[in-house]
Each structure stands twice: as C-alpha cells, then as structure tokens.
Amino acid sequence: NKLLISSLVVATTCGLTACSDSNNPNPAPETEMPAEYYVGGKLGTTFNNTASAYEQFTEAVDNQGLVASFKRGERIFESPFDIDAQSETPMRGLGPLWVRESCIACHPGYGHGARQNNYNSNTIGNGYLLVLTDENDTYLSSLTGMPQTGSSAPFKAPIDERKIQIKWLPYTDEWNNTFPDGESYSLIYPEVTIPQDAFYVPLQVGGVDIDYSQLRVRLENTIGIYGTGLLDAISDDDIRAQYRAEEAAGVSLNPGIWANGDFVSYYTNNVQGDGTKYVRRYTYALSRGSIQDGPGANAIWNITNVTRSDRRYHYMTAAYAKVASKDPDVQAQFYKYYPAMNKTGNVETDIYNYLMSN
C-alpha cells in the first residue's frame, strides 16, 4: 500500500508539473549564485549533478554557443580510431605506431587511470605511460616522449609491451607508515622492468647510443581531465615566484628549465601556433605551455598518430624510421600495405620517407 501511495503521489506531481504554464510572461529574474558555488570559476563550473557530470560541458560553453564544438571534440575523445584508411570509415588513420587507440582508454569517465599489474595498452583504464631516460633523467631520443607499444602491419612496435614487467612492492616512509594517533597504513610503489630484447630500436640519447645499464624506467599515470584547465589561470609571475623560492631554498631544479632566477626555455609552436613564448606548465616533461596548445590538444593526435589537414606528420623518431626502413620483414610487405608510397622504387627510401612524412 505504501508503494502504491508513493507511486500515486509521484504520478500526481508529474501531472501537475506537466500542466504548469511553461510560458510565464513574468518569469522570475535569474539570480547570481554566490561565489562559493563556482568552485571551478565561472568558466569551469557545471551545475549538472548527474552521474556523468564530469563528462558534460560547463555553463560557460553553453553560453558561448560552443556545445556543438564540445560534442565534436567529445566524439574524437571517446571513439577508438581504426587502421582502415578508407574514406567511409569515420574514425580512420590510426598508426602506423600508436600509444593508445583512443583518449578515453587512458581517461575512463574522463578521469584518471587505474592501477595495473601489467602493461596492456588495450586495457580500458590503463593510463600508464612509460618515461624512459638515462641516468641523468634525459629522455631517450630514439623513442617518442610517450613511447609507443602498438603498431599496424607491416611495422613492428618500438617496444614489445608483452615483455614489460610491473611489480608492486611495499614501501616504508619517514613516519614509519604511522599516523600521529598511532593508526598505521600501508604503501606500495611500482618497480618496472623492460628487458633489453623488448626494444626494437637502439637506446639513444641525443642520437648517441647508450648502454642498457644506463636506462631508467618510470611510470607516468594519467590525471583526470576535469579541472586541469584551471592551471592556465595561474599567472606566469606566480609560477616564476615559486621557482625562485625553491631555488633560494636550495631545491635541485632542472637546469634545462630554470637557472639563475629565471626560465632557461619557454614553450613555443611555430607550426600550428604563432611562436608566442609560454611558461612551461603542462605534462611530466613540461613540454607544453598553453591550454589552447596543451597536452590534450596534442595528445589526441600523438597518442593515436592520426594526422589532419594542418598536421601532416607522424609522431615518430628518425631512429625508428631508420631501423624499420632496413628491416627485411617490413620491406617485404611495405608496398602491399602502402602501394601509393612506391615513389622512388627504392623500398628502404620509401619506407623512411613515409614514416618521416617527407
């Protein structure tokens, strides 16, 4: 009976709502919300409280008439790309090498990646990216900044991800894993090993071979998409002041980014941008400086290696192109998969030129 009464009340309420006048000639004026309601600022706050709120556009997007653009970007973000190059395939152009087949694979629900026990790039929610450097923390030049483990025929992946090992080990911190009130907690950290035979390319820094013993491997995990744009609201002066404070305190800072009280280098883009200098503030490697040309705007293309009309080049290293162009297995099948690339009759040259977008 209680269920029946509740159902009747809900039905009656819905009926009354449906009969209300939706064309009120004297609508109540919109009231400005208190400042504390805009936790993400007026441009970054949504009042959508559904289960998918973090995937929705904000009020500012709607007010500027940008919902259609948001939806187009959402489709690119959420859809896996295909290696099929036929014009009727909507999400085509994956490869020839890639980090992931889609953006959402690393950002499920637009959030961060989940902890993994192995490096399988096809696992939805695996937001791990490899960070490969020498013992001086200099990135390997023979691999892309975000190393690729996927490939389409006839090419071979730069790293065989099946051989990557991830072990989670216990860790004891400086407080002996104990809160001030005596309660204890446990910590773990990943130990990542990539055997030497997993690499298809030589290990190089600045184009010079290094010994395998010099290799350092770290894991970088994705962060949630929502809220990251607020980093753009931090002024350059505030970032500069933070660097100066840390330098004065004796903190070891990257000399390639900061030295003697100021930035050594800035982020610029002379290809899709106008060459404006930006303070580096995005990505693990501080390789981006503006939200309009930030990690997401570039990763959509770098992660999948999809090209576009104003970005006609592959996310690729010359070291990989050189190795692949000399690989007999690749040479034997290249014209089968890429007949239009038979431009010189020299298969080694054609492979190299294709990969390097020459």
Residue ranges and their predicted role:
Residues 48-49, 53-69, 78-358:
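Extracytoplasmic redox metalloprotein regions
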